[in-house]
Amino acid sequence: VDPTQGMTTDTANNYKSKKREAEDEIQKAQQIINNGDATEQQITNETNRVNQAINAINKAKNDLRADKSQLENAYNQLIQNVDTNGKKPASIQQYQAARQAIETQYNNAKSEAHQILENSNPSVNEVAQALQKVEAVQLKVNDAIHILQNKENNSALVTAKNQLQQSVNDQPLTTGMTQDSINNYEAKRNEAQSAIRNAEAVINNGDATAKQISDEKSKVEQAL
């Protein structure tokens, strides 16, 4: 089994380097062993170098660290704040209900990932398990986010309503006018005020559909 599997690039490269050095030292030691003319000094020196290589590869093996970068990225994505500004209120309620349903799984995955990330020397298996849990709950979080719907654009209705309000505010002088024309003006003014109230209700309704907004805009323009 390759001990560098799932380890950080730096610690894995360090281990591989020390392993190559140890393998080179084994070959040199074998040459000394096979050399019947080797002196005691040569044997002692090679023994020391072999021991140094053993210590170096053991240290490199102990220094191997599980690569947590994937887990860290997944964790950071999981804890991102979900912006519900500009979303339809009904869809926000549905989103919150969906999040509530996975709250325990979410908290467990988040907590475990945080513990592993804080741990200076977790096993590769621990990192992999934590990542698996984070990715599993992230799919459910994504499903919940997809429930959110943007509010429809009502800016054209707001503009039309403001124009109608301006028309209502600009009251003409009725002095010297016939009663019929005054009555007609008052009736139209009441209709306009009613249209303004209806328009405001649609504007204030975050769940209003594009058709409701469009229909209300037409009514306001008729009242203009």
Residue ranges and their predicted role:
Residues 1-33, 61-117, 147-203:
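Amphipathic, heptad-repeat alpha-helical segments
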Residues 23-63, 110-149, 196-224:
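Charged, amphipathic alpha-helical scaffolding segments
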